């Protein structure tokens, strides 16, 4: 109960993370969620360079710090509204956590590849993959609902990626036309979101233990369909934004 009370998390959740990571690590995890977090962004390399973007943002009064792992990632602060920043309106950067960027960075994406993003909204990984294609190849970006595909389309228009096609599609439904055709499959699947509680504090109150099991089952169902799209020698990158090992390693 100490961890639950100290870090303001439901008791079932504190027990789960302690069981999976140990008490000391669990406390560090929950403490990190209480810290203020600057926005993390990814440079749109098809429009600018990291150096040019950093300079432009600083001239606009934005505080810019380099990311921890990737040369085109930055954290930004000292701003009120993204829409006021010309570089954002012009599609020179996207808001995207560096962990999300790493999921695409580790993929061996080459010019001319066919990339499929199966649960894509709002499109962060889709556009990162498109950037890495350098104008060649194609990214097929799919999600379940019209609302989600519209989000992807909005970001596509702002970022000006011409090698991205957006489709509304249920990932549980097999698409025979894609069997063994994809060079890189991005599968950032529906999850509990327990890894982003620092940004979305309400997650810990909305999620239940029962839902964790349901989400893990859904992930398995989706993976049982989409892995068939990967061509021999291709790659599937599976990722989530949760800490729950039941939705990841297990």
Put a short name on every predicted segment.
Residues 1-250:
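S-adenosylmethionine
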């Amino acid at each position: 109960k100490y961890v639950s009370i100290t870090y303001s998390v439901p008791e079932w959740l504190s027990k789960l993370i302690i069981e999976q990571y140990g008490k000391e690590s669990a406390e560090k995890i929950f403490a990190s969620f209480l810290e203020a977090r600057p926005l993390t962004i990814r440079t749109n390399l098809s429009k600018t360079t990291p150096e040019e973007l950093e300079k432009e943002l600083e001239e606009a009064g934005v505080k810019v710090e380099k990311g921890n792992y990737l040369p085109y990632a930055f954290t930004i602060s000292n701003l009120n509204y993204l829409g006021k920043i010309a570089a954002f309106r012009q599609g020179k950067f996207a808001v995207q956590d560096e962990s999300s960027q790493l999921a695409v960075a580790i993929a061996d994406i080459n010019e001319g590849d066919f990339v499929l993003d199966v649960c894509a909204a709002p499109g962060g990984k889709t556009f990162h993959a498109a950037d890495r294609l350098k104008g060649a190849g194609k990214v097929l970006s799919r999600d379940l609902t019209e609302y989600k595909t519209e989000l992807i389309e909005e970001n596509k228009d702002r970022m000006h990626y011409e090698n991205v096609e957006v489709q509304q599609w249920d990932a549980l439904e097999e698409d025979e036309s894609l069997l063994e055709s994809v060079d890189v499959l991005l599968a950032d699947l529906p999850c509990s979101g327990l890894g982003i509680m620092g940004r979305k504090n309400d997650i810990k109150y909305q999620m239940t233990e029962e839902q964790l099991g349901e989400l893990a089952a859904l992930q398995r169902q989706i993976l049982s369909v989409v892995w068939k799209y990967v061509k021999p020698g291709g790659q599937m990158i599976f990722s989530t934004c949760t800490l729950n090992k039941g939705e990841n390693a297990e």
